Every structure is written in C-alpha cells, then in structure tokens.
C-alpha cells in the first residue's frame, strides 16, 4: 500500500501492514505508525464517515483528551482515504470502575474543557460510544462518533447540545459497564438530570476521595 500521511510518503508491504495492524471496524482499518494511529477507510463503506473538509478543520483544533485528526492520508492518486491520530496505549476500559470516583470526575472535567474548545469552533458531536473510550489511567475519546461543523448555530448552543450528548453517554455507556438493571437505571434518572452539567451533579454526591466508581454507582442505586 502506497500512501501519503500529510507530506510523508509511505510504501508499506503486506508484512509491514500486518505488523502495524491494530484493529478494524465497519468503515476503516487502524494501523500504528510511530506515535500515531492511521485510520484508513475501507474501499466500500456503507456508513457515514468523516469527510476531508471536516477532518482538515478538526486537525487545526487542539484538544487534550478528545483525539482529533492530525494529518490527512491520501492514496497515490491524491484521493482522501483517512487521517492520522495520536496513538494511546490502553487498558480494558472496565478498569475505570475500580478507580476513585473523584478521578473519574476530574477526567470528565478535562473532557468538558475539550468539548468547550470544539464548541467554540462550531463543532457538534453527534454521537459517543463506549467503543471509542480509551483508558490508560486517564480517559480519552478516540475518534468519538461523528462530527458536524455548524457555523450557522451559536457556539453556546452547540456547547449545551454537546454536553447533553456527553451526559447521555455517561449514563448509557459508562454506567452500562456495571450491567445495571432497568430499575437501577430509573433510580439514576431520578437522581440526575443528564443534560449539560453531569460532572458537577455527580461531584455533589461523592462521599470521600477513596470511594470507587463501582461503589458510588451501587450506592446511588440502592
């Protein structure tokens, strides 16, 4: 495979690609290249995928935990086929359940800062999923969901919309790791408004710095 990562030309044989291979989904294959991960779209993709214009816009935005495109990837003919992102070593995401809940809340605050940065650049986060969460003692969102640039909306409204999406993600995905029953989920819904300030509401309920995420959620669903 012959590709350009930004201005750098790579001629990768099958053996090298096998060595670099990390994972794949319905729309793309992921390879590790140095400190970066290369997301290369499959030829036939039936899902919506990030277009070149949006990827280029995102590559100019600086975030801490939401991993955005760095360089555009093209084939020999100059066609857009993907992009590079920072590579993150990860542990199983369920490990977050064993950490002190205040650590999770601190991580959420950092992600909220990234959401503010994206919102200030008119970037709307359309979807978040647990498969996009990377955990290595810190929480990262690896290429989360889909993005839309909505310059016709005010950045404040985009921020509120993005935080609502983030709040739903915390409820439906992070808490899902505990395999909560339907009744327990209803209890959580009564306790929290999963809108734009989920982290602050959760922080008010923390008993001490040593309480783990698992203990906290179980306590809140009694």
Where are the regions that the model predicts?
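C-lobe/activation-segment region of protein kinase-like
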Residues: 136-222
